Amino acid sequence: MLRRTLFNLLVPATLLLGLAPALAESRLALVIGQSAYKSVPALPNPANDAKAMSQLLTESGFAVTAASDLSQAQLRDKISEFAGQVAAKGADTVALVFYAGHGLQIDGENYLVPIDVDPKREADIPIQAVRLNDILNTLTSAPSRLRILMLAACRNNPFGDISKSAGGGLALVDATFGAP
């Protein structure tokens, strides 16, 4: 079922990008699977999702960087490194980031959850998680032809015992068309 879902997501992207890679176009992908959480429920599927997505993207002509079970510092570093790779390839680059793991929103702000998160109270979550807008800002700082962010985030609040304001699922992200 996951392969069908991933396939259904990639078909429109493939059609959008064209069936054959353009000669001047570079396609870079960062695929992240977060499964081995230390203080919140582990998720077996993200590792499998990331592996399947890496294979599909490679078959679609992307140069894939795969990463799994990243701490907060590693997640931030990996996003920054990827943005640097995109910038180095130039403005004709197609950049795709796929994230599978825990994600949540608090008061309308989206967060991706690194494996080393260990909040003792709700106020710790934004400090220990990675804000989705920070990732978006980093990606938009690198000139590229197209940026795609795909999230397969678990909708269950992993911090239910300490966080009552975290919503189920992520908040709507309003991407600006043609953003730099």
Give the ranges of each region predicted by the language model.
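Second-shell loop/turn segments in exported
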Residues: 36-44, 63-69, 120-126
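N-terminal signal peptide c-region/cleavage motif recognized by signal peptidases
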Residues: 19-21
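Caspase-like (clan CD) cysteine peptidase catalytic core
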Residues: 26, 64, 76-99, 104-164
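Bacterial N-terminal signal peptides that target proteins for export
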Residues: 1-11
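Active-site-proximal C-terminal subdomain of hydrolase catalytic domains
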Residues: 33, 45-46, 50, 54-58, ...
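Short beta->alpha linker loops
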Residues: 70-74
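Cleaved targeting-peptide boundary
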Residues: 23-31
